[in-house]
């Protein structure tokens, strides 16, 4: 690392580092307390990033996304799982009707990440890069049902092993980076469903 000249090291963390959200919004300054392995590993990555970059004098920026979705997403997130089941005509299982996520369209994340990677104001800073407004899983399914009128779903109790999340504050990214997310869930799902349907047709 000493011989490599980095302009900036950008680490993609996760909203899972916060653990259970204690307030209406999660801020970058809030205490991190992950409650499962993924969030723990992401937080460990943040600590390693800060430690190594400080030691080798490398500028860094840490990004915390949440519930990313959009074209080419094959990571078995809830948005992709539900959309895939809807296309196949399978019944959706909603673990927690009122479970909230700050759904973030991939293009907004990409744009925000570029801003964070290039801005001098982002040096050695951590940013929430999300849409900035949480929606429930049920609201997501209702949007999905507009494209799949015969969509069936059942409700089950939320998985208490997973953190209870919600909205991430993006006020810091707005102020320092001029970050302006465009895709609310309605807009984003329109593009996502169009991609998924065209992808299915191409595979025939």
Where is each model-derived feature located?
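Conserved Rossmann-fold NAD(P)-dependent oxidoreductase catalytic core, especially the SDR/UDP-sugar
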Residues: 1-37
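Active-site loop of short-chain dehydrogenase/reductase
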Residues: 4-9, 58-59, 91, 124
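Flexible, glycine-rich beta-alpha linker
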Residues: 18-19, 36-37, 61-78
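Active-site Tyr-X1-5-Lys
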Residues: 20-22, 33-61, 87
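Short-chain dehydrogenase/reductase
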Residues: 30, 35-46, 76-80, 102-103, ...
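Hydrophobic alpha-helix immediately C-terminal to the catalytic Tyr-X-X-X-Lys motif of short-chain
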Residues: 44, 48, 52, 82, ...
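C-terminal substrate-binding subdomain of Rossmann-fold SDR/epimerase-dehydratase oxidoreductases
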Residues: 86, 90-204
